[in-house]
Amino acid sequence: MHMSKSFLLISMGLASISVHAQTLTRDNGAPVGDNQNSITAGENGSVLLQDVHLIQKLQRFARERIPERVVHARGTGAHGEFVASGDFSDLTLSSPFAQSGKVTPVFVRFSTVIHSKGSPETLRDPRGFATKFYTDQGNWDLVGNNLPVFFIRDSIKFPDMVHSLKPSPVTNLQDPNRFFDFFSSQPSATNMLTWVYTNLGTPASYRTMDGFGVHAYKWINQKGEVNYVKFHWKSQQGVKSLRPAEVTKVQGEDFNHLTNDLYTQINAGNFPKWDLYVKVLSPKALSKLDYNGLDATKVWLDVPEKKVGTMTLNRVPDNFFLETEQSAFAPSNIIPGIEPSEDRLLQGRLFAYADTQLYRLGANLFQLPVNSPKSPVANHNQDGPSNNSTGLGNVDSLDVNYEPSRLVNLTVDKQARAVETPLSGHVQQQAIRNPRDFFQAGVLYRSLSEQDKADLIHNLSGDLNKVNDAEVKAIMVSYFYRADKEYGTRLAKATDVNLKQVTKLASM
């Protein structure tokens, strides 16, 4: 019989595939005999409960999902490295900034904030910019956004704010009537609303947006000296956003544009870079600001920035769920030389972010590879679901799960002790002094180009015009009028709100 050369090659190829094929197994490692047909009682009989492969397959399928993040649900991540641009040990004893050229591995997760996991990435929203530094002192998480401020200054309002921005419990639709009703009683949101309704609220790509730590943090040096700092990631790709017409066009073509762009560019070797800058203020200088420097609704105006390093993202995750979805960020993940400030919003986030990760991933989340520190972990935390650690990991210490012990000498690092902070006053429950809710929104508005101002009015009035309550609409316009008269006047015209009513409300 004559066989063609091509037929022989195909046959040899199939044989090769057969020889090297991996056997399909169940989770217990046992081989699967048939993955196409269930076990039945006869040709047309019922499926048998003894079909353990079928049962396990369905059980595992039903348990594939973990709880969605309550905020920042839609996200994408990438690996990379941070390289210090100098020696900043005079300011902080944290290792990423200890010497020029110091390399620290990082994992970054970008995200939308309010919208759900499968939502379009074109929707207007702040964008999360969370960076996990795998330092030799432990993991440090810088958990920020692409905008420098936030809607509220006290974490006690965070659940209310998120509830107002999330879909209605009745219709399951996001509704401007709900969130502007909330914001009409929160003048502190004026600055952030101005930021998010500029075109920065619809970035063209994750590569072309800046990032901010939002809050003030403390840097502590070897001498125990304290300075307050704010962090700013500056994109080397420049900042590019989508204008209103572009948003509509992009959403119609690809509502995953942010993820697609990041993956495509990194896989093509076009690695995005960000320079990290810090603003530094001594406690005395912070106290002299004419607004509260610990207020998360404020930018530190006219404070110079200092470059401290550059981050490069150079690898996308091998598996989205294992790395991006299971990555867990929390501002409470800090290292020696960095401490939280007294910012009231940050103080609440220290608890809330860590707690929500425990809810999503369980008590042993730090054993997941993406969350596991590169530095050694030694403590007496034990057990819990999916635990695969023996704590200290030392055979000689397996029986000792407490401290102190004469059997196992587990020491502490005094450099990691909390810095001494002088306190005065009384326990109280009061709003901050000197809130100055409107002036920075005016500064931002006046800094915009005429085109950006027009887009801001278009974007903001588009949602305000969906508000049915005339009083809520007028109050909101009055806030923007108090920020800048031109801003408020143009917005009143675009929303058909009586300007006399606006000026009256603004003067109250």
Swiss-Prot record:
Known catalytic reactions: 2 H2O2 = O2 + 2 H2O
Main location: periplasm
Signal sequence residues: 1-21
Cofactor field: heme
UniProt keywords, alphabetically: Heme, Hydrogen peroxide, Iron, Metal-binding, Oxidoreductase, Periplasm, Peroxidase, Signal
UniProt key word ATP-binding: no
One Gene Ontology biological process: hydrogen peroxide catabolic process
Enzyme Commission number: 1.11.1.6
UniProt-annotated stretches for the region Disordered: 373-396
GO molecular function: catalase activity; heme binding; metal ion binding
Active site: 72, 145
Entry binding sites for heme: 353
EC top class named in words: oxidoreductase
Bias (Polar residues) ranges: 373-392
Recorded GO CC terms: cytoplasm; periplasmic space
Domain of life: Bacteria
Cellular compartment(s): Periplasm
Pfam families cross-referenced by the UniProt entry: Catalase, Catalase-rel
PANTHER family found in the cross-reference section: CATALASE (PTHR11465), CATALASE-2 (PTHR11465:SF23)
Function per UniProt: Decomposes hydrogen peroxide into water and oxygen; serves to protect cells from the toxic effects of hydrogen peroxide.
Family affiliation: Belongs to the catalase family.
Protein name per Swiss-Prot or TrEMBL: Catalase
Native source species: Vibrio vulnificus (strain YJ016)
